Every structure is written in structure tokens, then in C-alpha cells.
């Protein structure tokens, strides 16, 4: 409660853990940085589905127009999904540590449990635990989880060796993604 989503909220229906992983990767982040909009006094990035999501070249065979069940057995999708699940688990444990919260079953079947602070001290601490604060402090475990995810995504593109060799700079990633985008638009 206290937060009402507006037109700035984007939902990605039908995107499984592998799609979530690609969207959380350095590859998509670079695409967002280059093709996304800027807004406000701080010139903050703003996601734009038309310029970013719809033009982003997902790894071949793992694109959002293909049902996730169709590539469930693809080792590339499985590796991305595993790394994405681990990243999500680590972030969730930091955002909502078991010692500060209790999970209460939702009254409507099928909805996730409600997360409630155990007491007022927990509520105060939980208010500080935001994704923004987490990424601003960038603990080592978060970097490790993102590197594992980025490696899985690089493998899906066929760029795993270059990623491990450290030759995939942000500019090189963007150039390769742009070439893929152009190839797919031309096909």
C-alpha cells in the first residue's frame, strides 16, 4: 500500500526466468543506457518499451515471441534461468531477511504471501532496504551473482569465450547487439 503504479510501470507477461535474466544482464543494461530516454533534473534513465524492449535482440531462439516451454530444454535457457533465480533469491533475502519479516498467506488463492515486518524496528530497517540502496552499495555477492548471469547470457549469444577473456567492453557489447538488431530487421 502507499504506492500506485502509473504509466511508467512495465510488465513483461510470458517472460520466464530466462527472459528475466536477459533483461537483468549487462547486455540489456547497455542497450537500455544507449537507447533509453533520460528524464528529470537528475537526467535519470527511463525505460522505454518502444525504443528498448521491442528493439533489443534477445539471444537467438530465446526471444519473447517464442513460448518459454518451447526452449525449456535448451541448456542456454536453463543456465540463464538458474543464474537469474540465484540473483533473485539473493536480492529477495537482502530486501526481506527472514529475521525481519513474516510471510502471511494472502486471502486470495494464487496470490503470493504478504510480507509483513515482525515489529516496528524491523519496519524501520526494511524501509532502508530498497533495490536502489542495494545497487548503490553494490556488495561483492551482488557483483558475483551479476557476473554469473552475464556469463550465462554471453554464452547464449555465443560470446562466452570473449566474456571470460574480458574482451567484451560495453562498446563491443553494444556494437554486437546493434549488428544483431540490424540483421534481424533485414531478414
What are these regions (language model features)?
Residues 1-187:
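S-adenosyl-L-methionine
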Amino acid at each position: 500500500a502507499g504506492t500506485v503504479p502509473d504509466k511508467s510501470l512495465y510488465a513483461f507477461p510470458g517472460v520466464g526466468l530466462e527472459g528475466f535474466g536477459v533483461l537483468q544482464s549487462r547486455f540489456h543494461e547497455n542497450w537500455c543506457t544507449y537507447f533509453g530516454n533520460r528524464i528529470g533534473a537528475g537526467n535519470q534513465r527511463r525505460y522505454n518499451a518502444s525504443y528498448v524492449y521491442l528493439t533489443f535482440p534477445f539471444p537467438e531462439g530465446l526471444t519473447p515471441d517464442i513460448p518459454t516451454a518451447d526452449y525449456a530444454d535448451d541448456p542456454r535457457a536453463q543456465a540463464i534461468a538458474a543464474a537469474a533465480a540465484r540473483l533473485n533469491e539473493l536480492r529477495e533475502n537482502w530486501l526481506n531477511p527472514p529475521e525481519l519479516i513474516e510471510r502471511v498467506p494472502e486471502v486470495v488463492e494464487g496470490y503470493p504471501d504478504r510480507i509483513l515486518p515482525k515489529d516496528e524496528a524491523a519496519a524501520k530497517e526494511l524501509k532502508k532496504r530498497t533495490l536502489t540502496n542495494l545497487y548503490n552499495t553494490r556488495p561483492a555477492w551482488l557483483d558475483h551473482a551479476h557476473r554469473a548471469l552475464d556469463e550465462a547470457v554471453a554464452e547464449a549469444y555465443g560470446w562466452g569465450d570473449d566474456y571470460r577473456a574480458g574482451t567484451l567492453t560495453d562498446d563491443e557489447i553494444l556494437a554486437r547487439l546493434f549488428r544483431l538488431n540490424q540483421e534481424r530487421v533485414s531478414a
